[in-house]
Regions:
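N-terminal amphipathic/basic leader segments beginning at the initiator methionine
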Residues: 1-44, 48, 56, 81, ...
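A glycine- and small-aliphatic-rich helix-loop capping segment at beta-alpha/alpha-beta transitions
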Residues: 60-68, 87-90, 110-114, 137-150, ...
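Glycine-rich oxoanion-binding loops at beta->alpha junctions
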Residues: 75-119, 159-160, 164-165
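Internal gly/pro-rich beta-alpha loop/helix module
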Residues: 140-226, 235
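Accessory alpha-helical/coil subdomains and C-terminal extensions
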Residues: 183-186, 208-289, 293
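Active-site segments that bind and position negatively charged phosphate/pyrophosphate groups
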Residues: 269-346, 354-355
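Internal helix-turn-beta structural module
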Residues: 330-419
Length: 419
């Protein structure tokens, strides 16, 4: 690989520091401890944690829950269990599509919380990814997997997907809280959806559902979903609209992630500007937009940082491998080619991006040229949704490993003056 210029070296070093500091600021340990500090539960206490950050949240919570603790269950993504937790059974399952292990972990949680009394409390820790990981389907698993894959392939957004999921599940849309009744549920939620809609985060197992049957049916028809008669009938059934046994506390969000990244940029000498913390568009469009901003401001003579937080979507056109953050980086690479002082990175706060081992992607003004030297057609790779292999060929993958948190993604454009 050709030797990189000093500005690019500096940009990549800065990017690594920004990623590390931003993710550290939204780790759930301290947030869970704050939520449980001073809380007193008089009866028996049970712990259920679901989502990509479930193990980390449960580990922190277990240290706080000593008196009357009667057991717990964690259901998280493969590779996200980091050890044993006393008196807590840990399960790993499929994401973004549920599998048999997702169901096995959820069954354990349901069994743990059966036949509770009014004096009992279920501490429920919820994070993104819970829609796939915490599941008791009202359809055969294979059929539910097919519906999920249809929605993902159609580029449905997370609210649309979860509106459908709620009606096909025995635990979503407030139904888990109803299962726990008459016990009290204290829910601590790590938000991964823009605007923090509690009924949509992991499909709201303990929160009243604000969506309607009419909306669910409209989504199914608009995307041309191929559904069985049973599935159509379930979409027409309403979910719980009121719950009286739940207290909810939200902690951690993409807004905090962006603020932490901006603070890290400022500490490194950049002038940061958060463009949005509600990014929701095609991933390749986000990359192109940042490239346009880079070309507009590349000669301003300042160290600038433009930040966006949220969750883009990928329209599946090919059969390649990648994720939305990698696709942002690949798209940006084409637009910033030749700019020696520009770099774009995009990373998922949970450490995973699509069905890959990467958290995201990074590209600078030399990335597209390096791809050509390696025999990689960047445009074709983008069309094939094959950002993983394209970026991997030139050292453009970001790999953090599982972080233990999940508050959407952060995307950053860095512009640095020559030194």
């Amino acid at each position: 690989m050709q030797e990189k210029s000093k500005p690019v070296d500096n940009l990549r070093a800065d990017a690594e520091k920004i990623i590390t500091r931003a993710i550290a600021a939204v780790l759930p340990d301290a947030a869970v401890e704050r939520a449980l500090k001073g809380k007193t539960f008089l009866g028996r206490v049970y712990l259920v944690a679901a989502g990509k950050a479930a193990w980390q949240m449960a580990h922190a919570a277990r240290a706080c829950l000593q008196d009357n603790f009667c057991g717990g269950v964690v259901v998280t993504k493969y590779g996200h269990v980091n050890g044993e937790i006393a008196d807590v059974a840990c399960f790993e399952g499929g994401h973004p599509v549920p599998d048999e292990n997702s169901l096995r972990g959820t069954d354990a949680a349901l069994a743990l919380t059966e036949d509770l009394t009014e004096s009992d409390t279920v501490v429920f820790l919820l994070s993104g990814g819970g829609s796939a990981l915490f599941e008791k389907p009202l359809l055969p698993l294979a059929e539910l997997q097919d519906v999920t894959n249809q929605l993902l392939a159609a580029s449905a957004d997370i609210v649309e997907i979860n509106t459908i999921r709620k009606r096909l599940s025995a635990v979503k849309g407030g139904r888990f809280a109803r299962h726990c009744a008459p016990a009290q549920v204290f829910a601590v939620v790590l938000s991964d959806i823009l605007g923090d809609p509690l009924d949509m985060i992991a499909s709201g197992p303990t929160y009243p559902d604000s969506s309607s049957c009419a909306q669910a049916l409209d989504i199914a028809k608009r995307y041309g979903l191929r559904l069985s008669e049973r599935a159509w009938a379930l979409l027409a059934q309403e979910t719980p609209k009121t719950l009286t046994n739940v207290e909810t506390q939200i902690t951690g969000s993409v807004r905090e992630l962006c603020a932490a990244a901006a603070a890290a940029c400022e500490a490194l000498g950049y002038e940061p500007m958060i463009l949005t913390d509600c990014l929701c568009c095609e991933a390749c469009e986000a990359g192109s937009m940042l490239a346009s901003i880079a070309r507009t401001h590349a000669r301003d003579g300042k160290n600038l940082a433009f930040l966006m937080g949220g969750e883009t979507v990928v329209h599946l056109r090919g059969k390649g491998l990648g994720g939305r953050n990698q696709e942002i980086a690949l798209s940006a690479a084409l637009g910033i080619e030749g700019l020696s002082n520009a770099l774009v990175f995009s990373v998922g706060s949970d450490g995973t991006d699509g069905p890959t081992d990467a958290a995201g992607g990074i590209a600078d003004g030399e990335t597209a040229q390096l791809m050509r030297q390696k025999g990689v057609d960047a445009v074709q790779s983008l069309n094939d949704n094959d950002a993983y292999h394209a970026l991997g060929a030139v050292g453009g993958l970001i790999k953090t490993g599982a972080t233990g948190t999940n508050v959407n993604d952060v995307t950053v454009l860095l512009l640095r003056t020559a030194e």
